[in-house]
Amino acid sequence: MDALVLSMIAWITASTGLIVSEPPRIAFVRDSHFQQQFHSEDAQAKPEATTPNHEKPAAEKFFSVQGFYLRATATVYLPETWQLAALRDQSTLLHELVHHAQRLNKVGVACPGQLERQAYDLQVAWLREQGVAQPFDLIGIDEFTMLMLTACLPPDG
């Protein structure tokens, strides 16, 4: 796992110029507690998450968290069902590592959606480099949904 994390961090740095001086902590959470952990009060301190899941019915797509990064503790949370050999799971880890790199480099954006956009764009690019012809299908998201998840919306008022 350490070798994968280090190689992904090197790839992120080469792709973005973002420097990662220290890898994040990685924690595995039991499936029964994974969604609860993401939605907990502590996690509301700016978690960034990989959410879509193509294995769920459309109504549940947006509620299935695949992984998340908690900025306050510099921790990537993954479900205990995460598999090192599964390319889709690896790409979830990469997505969350992008959020870690963004945090360490204090990436400034107009809205949180821009952080997600960069993470998804890099996740898709990485999957394409791994030979995945249809990366959106593999991660269970279409381009329109990604646009909606990453849009900067005006504040209510």
What spans do the regions from the language model cover?
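Auxiliary, metal-adjacent structural segments of Zn-dependent hydrolase domains
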Residues: 1-76, 82-83, 130-132
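Stable alpha-helical elements in mature extracytoplasmic
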Residues: 4-8, 89-93, 115-118, 122-123
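Short pre-active-site segment immediately N-terminal to the catalytic Zn-binding motif
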Residues: 77-93
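Mature extracytoplasmic domains of secretory-pathway proteins
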Residues: 84-86, 98-101, 109
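Active-site recognition of the HExxH zinc-binding catalytic motif
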Residues: 91-104
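Surface-exposed, polar/charged faces of alpha-helical domains
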Residues: 103-110, 132
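Post-HExxH zinc-binding segment in Zn-dependent metallohydrolases
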Residues: 112-145
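Short, low-complexity, Pro/Ser/Thr/Gly-rich segments in the mature regions of secreted, periplasmic
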Residues: 142-157
